[in-house]
Amino acid sequence: MALIKVKPTSPGRRSVVKVVTPELHKGKPYAPLLEKQSKKAGRNNNGHITTRHQGGGHKQHYRIVDFRRNKDGIPAKVERLEYDPNRSAHLALLVYADGERRYIIAPRGVSVGAQLVSGSDAPIRAGNALPLRNIPVGSTIHCIELQPGKGAQVARSAGTSVQLLAREGSYAQLRLRSGEVRRVHVDCKATIGEVGNEEHSLRSIGKAGAVRWRGVRPTVRGVVMNPVDHPHGGGEGKTAAGMNPVSPWGLPTKGYRTRSNKRTDNMRVSRRPANKR
């Protein structure tokens, strides 16, 4: 992969910096692992907006990704690497020895033809999935389960990884990308290495229309709204908010902690640093 700056043939192309990925498959995705996906535009079943700034965008198929890696002991070969419009990471299409094909999140450094395997006896190599009890302390891992057998929930975005700090009894301590240290059961599986497409965060989309293609709608500042729409709204002419920043519903923003899940507080060894948003 490499970053290139395109020629400024128009105002919309002038700021574009894109990731060149010649290793990705140029054809269609593997059809048996596709599902139809309808647009929700951030609405719930009542038609009310539950997530702002969503709507439109190009049609997409959902790729069924294997987050469980439960074909233990059966070797697989990476048939090809593919683009996935639903996530920042790329996908790797695996062909198992029994003929089954599955998508996984493509780890960094794994190329076409690589041999991967999952299970307790798998070698410590990028792309292999093992329980945390069998992974050496200090290893870099991704696609981590929070409950055994539930499937990976942590560290699935492009370029992310987690460090295995220690093991104490039935739990392992992990340092997440945010800086938080969390306890996870040692029977939970994780994949060795870090997620690929690490240059994803360095790209520049270049124009507003390209963001709309991704299903993202504009964000309107509260200070330019009316008082009925936002606490920062109103005033004669161009005025400041006159208060600490708040959300449209009056909750403090810009660093205000909103976590309310007390049930899993005992799984956190230390919170993320205050300056990490």
UniProtKB/Swiss-Prot annotation:
Coiled coil: none annotated. Keywords: Ribonucleoprotein, Ribosomal protein, RNA-binding, rRNA-binding. NCBIfam families: rplB_bact. Residues 35-60, 225-277 are annotated as: Disordered. The keyword rRNA-binding applies. Part of the 50S ribosomal subunit. Forms a bridge to the 30S subunit in the 70S ribosome. GO terms for molecular function: rRNA binding; structural constituent of ribosome; transferase activity. One of the primary rRNA binding proteins. Required for association of the 30S and 50S subunits to form the 70S ribosome, for tRNA binding and peptide bond formation. It has been suggested to have peptidyltransferase activity; this is somewhat controversial. Makes several contacts with the 16S rRNA in the 70S ribosome. GO terms for biological process: cytoplasmic translation. One of its GO terms (cellular component) is large ribosomal subunit. The keyword Cell cycle does not apply. SMART domains: Ribosomal_L2 (SM01383), Ribosomal_L2_C (SM01382). Residues 43-53 have a biased composition (Polar residues). Pfam families: Ribosomal_L2 (PF00181), Ribosomal_L2_C (PF03947). This is Large ribosomal subunit protein uL2. Belongs to the universal ribosomal protein uL2 family. Gene3D superfamilies: 2.30.30.30, Nucleic acid-binding proteins, Ribosomal protein L2, domain 3. It comes from the Bacteria.
